[in-house]
């Protein structure tokens, strides 16, 4: 299964190996979640100040976070679904703070690769509708994350 992923690096510090890691882990997740070929998403790498601005402007949270997901398939109030058109499935946008990912990798005592893969996967699952607002939803989402990370070889 192939995803079309548009990568945007606003930090100018993301190595090609990290882009490839994310492409591969999200490809594995898409395969395990049975996402159709040609589905699209974007992944943008930012600094803490930029992710803080996005949080403040769109989520009313004036602080940096590690990853933000904007799902295209979530219908907002007053929005209408476009049906019948032969268009690729647009999953949405992931925004990852590179400095925050580095901080958390150190904090949790694992590699930057593992943290970056985890954050990309976590955000991707949000794009697919997974959430962790209730205990039951959290158990389902975190269980699925663990399965995919282990299948990919990035388990703890």
From Swiss-Prot:
<keyword id="KW-0862">Zinc</keyword>
<dbReference type="GO" id="GO:0008270">
    <property type="term" value="F:zinc ion binding"/>
</dbReference>
<dbReference type="InterPro" id="IPR002036">
    <property type="entry name" value="YbeY"/>
</dbReference>
<dbReference type="GO" id="GO:0004222">
    <property type="term" value="F:metalloendopeptidase activity"/>
</dbReference>
<dbReference type="Pfam" id="PF02130">
    <property type="entry name" value="YbeY"/>
</dbReference>
<dbReference type="InterPro" id="IPR020549">
    <property type="entry name" value="YbeY_CS"/>
</dbReference>
<feature type="binding site">
    <location>
        <position position="132"/>
    </location>
    <ligand>
        <name>Zn(2+)</name>
    </ligand>
</feature>
<dbReference type="InterPro" id="IPR023091">
    <property type="entry name" value="MetalPrtase_cat_dom_sf_prd"/>
</dbReference>
<feature type="binding site">
    <location>
        <position position="126"/>
    </location>
    <ligand>
        <name>Zn(2+)</name>
    </ligand>
</feature>
<feature type="binding site">
    <location>
        <position position="122"/>
    </location>
    <ligand>
        <name>Zn(2+)</name>
    </ligand>
</feature>
<keyword id="KW-0540">Nuclease</keyword>
<keyword id="KW-0479">Metal-binding</keyword>
<keyword id="KW-0698">rRNA processing</keyword>
<comment type="similarity">
    <text>Belongs to the endoribonuclease YbeY family.</text>
</comment>
<keyword id="KW-0690">Ribosome biogenesis</keyword>
<dbReference type="GO" id="GO:0004521">
    <property type="term" value="F:RNA endonuclease activity"/>
</dbReference>
<dbReference type="GO" id="GO:0005737">
    <property type="term" value="C:cytoplasm"/>
</dbReference>
<keyword id="KW-0378">Hydrolase</keyword>
<keyword id="KW-0963">Cytoplasm</keyword>
<dbReference type="GO" id="GO:0006364">
    <property type="term" value="P:rRNA processing"/>
</dbReference>
<keyword id="KW-0255">Endonuclease</keyword>
<comment type="function">
    <text>Single strand-specific metallo-endoribonuclease involved in late-stage 70S ribosome quality control and in maturation of the 3' terminus of the 16S rRNA.</text>
</comment>
<protein>
    <recommendedName>
        <fullName>Endoribonuclease YbeY</fullName>
        <ecNumber>3.1.-.-</ecNumber>
    </recommendedName>
</protein>
């Amino acid at each position: 299964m192939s995803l079309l992923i548009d990568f945007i690096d606003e930090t100018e510090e993301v190595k090609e190996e990290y882009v490839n890691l994310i492409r591969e882990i999200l490809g594995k997740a898409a395969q395990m979640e049975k996402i159709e070929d040609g589905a699209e998403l974007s992944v943008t790498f930012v600094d803490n100040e930029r992710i803080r601005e996005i949080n403040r402007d769109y989520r009313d949270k004036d602080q940096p976070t590690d990853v933000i997901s904007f799902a295209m398939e979530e219908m907002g109030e007053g929005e209408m679904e476009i049906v019948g058109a032969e268009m690729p499935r647009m999953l949405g946008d992931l925004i990852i703070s590179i400095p925050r990912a580095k901080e958390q990798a150190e904090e949790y005592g694992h590699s930057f690769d593992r943290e970056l893969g985890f954050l990309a996967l976590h955000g991707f699952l949000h794009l697919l509708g997974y959430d962790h607002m209730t205990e039951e939803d959290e158990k389902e989402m975190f269980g699925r994350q663990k399965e995919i990370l282990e299948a990919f070889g990035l388990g703890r």
